[in-house]
């Protein structure tokens, strides 16, 4: 079965700030989008790459990834207002043919081959997978500034991307979410959350990630990513 990577690069980057959109900021001479695309281009188990970008930036992004350097890129499409909208547009663009699909945030440019391969292997036996790392910090629950609970740390993992699914599974989960008037107020902020909420019978397998697979949220994160690339 084919495996397609969807690089989600349609975020607004409000916390990052600056005149240049975050996904077009450079890290070690390449934009954040290119780092993610290059990682999936190099992955033997990836058959195609679809890039979802901010409306108005598609021309710039096409110039970066449809220049012959990345042969697996099949298209660049406009995303939506929210991450959920962007995911749904990607699902529609992938069509009806069954495949495995990995959704990856372009804001995580240091994704490695071991993690990608782990997702692909897991999808050989599972219908949904999510990359996770253990939490080294104690996580607490709070309401109105008052601590209300302290979940067991050994039961907590931090989510990263990629998140992978059989296409028909993630498509069905989003169909159910779209039909639910209460979805926009739910805690399902990513695709694994949508599956957990609307297809509880589908097990979501945890795939070990890496602390290097950090998310670029603030300008200072670029400095840390540069240091990690230098080793």
Regions found by a protein language model. Give the residues of each.
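Conserved N-terminal catalytic core of the sugar/cofactor nucleotidyltransferase
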Residues: 34-98, 180-181
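Conserved beta-loop-beta/alpha segment of the NTase-like Rossmann-fold superfamily
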Residues: 75, 80-143, 155, 159-161, ...
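N-terminal glycine-rich phosphate-binding loop and ensuing alpha1 helix
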Residues: 1-58
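A residue-level structural signature of the nucleotidyltransferase/glycosyltransferase Rossmann-like core
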Residues: 50, 108, 128-130, 148, ...
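Hydrophobic packing residues within well-ordered alpha-helices of enzyme cores
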Residues: 16, 61-62, 119, 139, ...
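Conserved alpha/beta core of the MobA/IspD/sugar-nucleotide pyrophosphorylase nucleotidyltransferase superfamily
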Residues: 158-231
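Short beta-strand segments
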Residues: 6-10, 51-52, 104, 131-134, ...
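Residues at the starts of beta-strands that form the adenosine-phosphate
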Residues: 47-49, 100, 127-128, 203
